[in-house]
From Swiss-Prot:
Name the record gives this protein: DnaJ homolog subfamily A member 1
Chain sites annotated for binding Zn(2+) 1: 134, 137, 193, 196
CR-type ZnF: 121-205
GO MF term set: ATP binding; ATPase activator activity; C3HC4-type RING finger domain binding; G protein-coupled receptor binding; Hsp70 protein binding; low-density lipoprotein particle receptor binding; protein-folding chaperone binding; Tat protein binding
Assembly: Identified in a complex with HSPA1B and BAX. Interacts with RNF207.
UniProtKB keywords: Acetylation, Chaperone, Cytoplasm, Endoplasmic reticulum, Lipoprotein, Membrane, Metal-binding, Methylation, Microsome, Mitochondrion, Nucleus, Phosphoprotein, Prenylation, Repeat, Zinc, Zinc-finger
GO CC term (a single one): nucleus
Organism whose genome encodes this protein: Homo sapiens
Gene that encodes the chain: DNAJA1
Phosphoserine PTM sites in chain numbering: 83, 335
Length: 397
């Protein structure tokens, strides 16, 4: 039993979630609430990152489950990657802060795909916007020689203010320079490039052709190196496409295997059957259970080489795993004489010799709500004993 579930709730998972479920939840939420897409959701992005930072680490997760967020703070386990953006970059393969300083920002996009796409392979065209260096001013932001050091911050991009908080006590506050917006330089409005308005970069539409290979997985990344945002003086970043698989109506993927449930009737479970299955590449395969091969409720069987293609080895496939659910007939489906005949055909049942010490009881259908109602009524009864529900009496003279 975990002490608190706040981090799990932030990611939208249960406390017993696997690492794969945590990764999938973080991936979707981080892309949705990234500051580039939702500038007003910075706090939400921070909460998502902190939750994943703790729960993705086995030791931190154990500490959190036992003592909650307070245990993380007291246990000194809150260091992690240092910032939400570091966690994001490490997760999506963007490197760390030092790499970001040498390269332009990576652009991460989520691409929704079907299980059929991952099985057969597919090609998608993706239209997106990215920053490119302005070709009118060649990334200078204005005329040659128009760029000057910001006199407000002296080129640092940051301002430091001293705030007195008490006698002999001061607080030093560092903030982004409002004059140059943190760039450390400024351009006079009259000298700014008309195309980029002094920003040195412009937005450009880019159409990418994304090739989805057979056997790729949910969450797999496809990287277009050097196709990301450009910034003057930096190498271009990458465009990273993250595959997001939609749920399938029949099949569930487990590694290289496909899993499905199949309903069969009692007669099929006892006497055999043939069942067609439509595959993800539009073939129809037929599975057979021969008479005398009993299939019990919950039995699991498999078909070799009918699972997912193995990535980069597309001619090899996993297994198709089938769990059988046996549907039993309704009460009274046979007349007494036919039921007697059926009993003679089935294996003999074991008779119980009754003794005087035995009590006959009746077997009834289980009602899962009965215990809940009994528990509620019991609490109400105890409440009445301690707090009688008498009305307010009128005062008499």
């Amino acid at each position: 039993m975990v002490k608190e579930t706040t981090y799990y709730d932030v990611l939208g998972v249960k406390p017993n979630a696997t690492q794969e479920e945590l990764k999938k939840a973080y991936r979707k939420l981080a892309l949705k609430y990234h500051p580039d897409k939702n500038p007003n959701e910075g706090e939400k992005f921070k909460q998502i990152s902190q939750a994943y930072e703790v729960l993705s680490d086995a030791k931190k997760r154990e500490l959190y489950d036992k003592g909650g967020e307070q245990a993380i703070k007291e246990g000194g386990a809150g260091g992690g990657f240092g910032s939400p953006m570091d966690i994001f970059d490490m997760f999506f393969g963007g490197g760390g802060r030092m790499q970001r300083e040498r390269r332009g920002k990576n652009v991460v996009h989520q691409l929704s795909v079907t299980l059929e796409d991952l099985y057969n392979g597919a090609t998608r065209k993706l239209a997106l916007q990215k920053n490119v260096i302005c070709d009118k001013c060649e990334g200078r932001g204005g005329k040659k020689g128009a760029v000057e050091c910001c006199p407000n911050c002296r080129g640092t991009g940051m301002q430091i203010r001293i705030h007195q908080i008490g006698p002999g006590m001061v607080q030093q506050i560092q903030s982004v320079c409002m004059e140059c917006q943190g760039h450390g330089e400024r351009i006079s409005p009259k000298d700014r490039c008309k195309s980029c308005n002094g920003r040195k970069i412009v937005r450009e539409k880019k159409i990418l052709e994304v090739h989805i290979d057979k056997g790729m997985k949910d969450g797999q990344k496809i990287t277009f190196h050097g196709e990301g945002d450009q910034e003057p003086g930096l190498e271009p970043g990458d465009i990273i496409i993250v595959l997001d698989q939609k749920d399938h109506a029949v099949f569930t993927r487990r590694g290289e295997d496909l899993f499905m449930c199949m309903d069969i009737q009692l007669v099929e479970a006892l006497c055999g059957f043939q069942k067609p299955i439509s595959t993800l590449d539009n073939r129809t395969i037929v599975i057979t259970s021969h008479p005398g091969q009993i299939v019990k409720h919950g039995d699991i069987k498999c078909v070799l080489n009918e699972g997912m293609p193995i990535y980069r080895r597309p001619y090899e496939k996993g297994r198709l795993i089938i769990e059988f659910k046996v549907n039993f007939p309704e009460n009274g489906f046979l007349s007494p004489d036919k039921l007697s005949l059926l009993e003679k055909l089935l294996p003999e049942r074991k008779e119980v010799e009754e003794t005087d010490e035995m009590d006959q009881v009746e077997l009834v259908d289980f009602d899962p709500n009965q215990e809940r109602r009994r528990h509620y009524n019991g609490e109400a009864y105890e409440d009445d004993e301690h707090h009688p529900r008498g009305g307010v009496q009128c005062q008499t003279s």
